[in-house]
Structure formats: structure tokens, C-alpha cells
Amino acid sequence: TIINVKCTSPKQCLKPCKDLYGPHAGAKCMNGKCKCYNN
């Protein structure tokens, strides 16, 4: 799921993704936006 959070690295996405999807959520930075996924 792409969320509306700007990023330059996946680390910036980890907290917002975990806040939204819980502690097991993963995060990537794609095209300057965060992408969250559940494992």
C-alpha cells in the first residue's frame, strides 16, 4: 500500500507503516513515497 509520506530511505517509512499496519509491517521507499506491506 502506498501511503502519502515522503521519503528518501525506507527507514523513514518504517514508523508510519508500523503505526498504520502494526508491528509486523514492512516498508519500502518507492518514487519518493512510502510503501507499506504486511508480511
Swiss-Prot record:
Its ancestry begins with: Eukaryota, Metazoa, Ecdysozoa, Arthropoda, Chelicerata
Site for Basic residue of the functional dyad, residues? 28
List the source organism.
Centruroides elegans
Q: What is this protein called?
A: Potassium channel toxin alpha-KTx 2.9
Q: Which GO terms describe its cellular component?
A: extracellular region
Q: Which GO terms describe its molecular function?
A: ion channel inhibitor activity; potassium channel regulator activity; toxin activity
Q: State its role.
A: Blocks Kv1.3/KCNA3 voltage-gated potassium channels of human T-lymphocytes (Kd=0.25 nM).
Tissue expression, per UniProt?
Answer: Expressed by the venom gland.
User: At what residues does the UniProt record annotate the site feature described as Aromatic residue of the functional dyad?
Assistant: 37
Similarity field: Belongs to the short scorpion toxin superfamily. Potassium channel inhibitor family. Alpha-KTx 02 subfamily.
Q: Does the keyword Secreted apply?
A: yes
Which keywords accompany this UniProt record? Amidation, Disulfide bond, Ion channel impairing toxin, Neurotoxin, Potassium channel impairing toxin, Secreted, Toxin, Voltage-gated potassium channel impairing toxin
- Which residue positions does Asparagine amide occur at? 39
Alphabetical list of Pfam families matching this protein:
Toxin_2
Q: Among its keywords, does the record have Secreted?
A: yes
Other remarks in the entry:
Negative results: does not inhibit calcium-activated potassium channels (KCa3.1/KCNN4) of human T-lymphocytes. Does not inhibit voltage-gated Shaker potassium channels. Does not inhibit Kv2.1/KCNB1 potassium channels.
**Domain text:** Has the structural arrangement of an alpha-helix connected to a beta-sheet by disulfide bonds (CSalpha/beta).
Q: Where in the cell is it found?
A: Secreted
Annotated disulfide bonds: 7-29, 13-34, 17-36
